[in-house]
Amino acid sequence: VNDQQRAFAQRVADLGADVVLGTGPHVLQPVEWVPRADGGQTLVWYSLGNMLNTQLGVDQRTGIIASFEVVPGADGGPATVANPSGVLTWMHYDWTPEEEAALQLDARHALSIQPLAASAELLARTTYGESVEQIAEQSAAILGPLVALSPGV
C-alpha cells in the first residue's frame, strides 16, 4: 500500500464513506479499518487483486470476492459495517510449458475464474509448484487478520 492509496482512503473516509474497495495494483493488499473525522470507521480493502486477467505471476492471478455485513443501527441510528470476509479466487488459463518458455503471450486461452479452494487440479497444470494451501496462506497473511476467509466451494 502506498502513500497515495492511504491518503485517498483517508480522504474518502473523512467524507463519510463506510467502505472503500480498491483495485488497480493487480495484487491483493491489506484490509484495514480507517478512523473517520466523524468518529466512525471505514472498512478499506486497498486492493481486491485480479479477477478475469492473463497476468503471469501467482500473486497477480489471485483475487478475492469481498464481503461484509451491514448492521442496522439501534433505534434508527446509522448502520455500520462489520465482519469483513471473502472467498479467494484463482484465475486460470491454458498455456503449455513450451508456450510459456517461449513467452508466447497470445497463446493463453480457455480463461476461467473459480474459488481458489477448488483450483488444485488447475494449479497442478501450471509451472508454479505452489498448492492451494500455500497460496491461501500467503493471501491471508497479505489481507491481514480482519478478513475471515471461506473456501467458497
Model-predicted segments: where are they?
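A short C-terminal boundary segment appended to hydrolase-like catalytic domains
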Residues: 59-153
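Active-site/ligand-binding-proximal alpha/beta "capping" segment
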Residues: 1, 5-11, 99-108
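Conserved beta-sheet core of the metallophosphoesterase superfamily
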Residues: 2-64
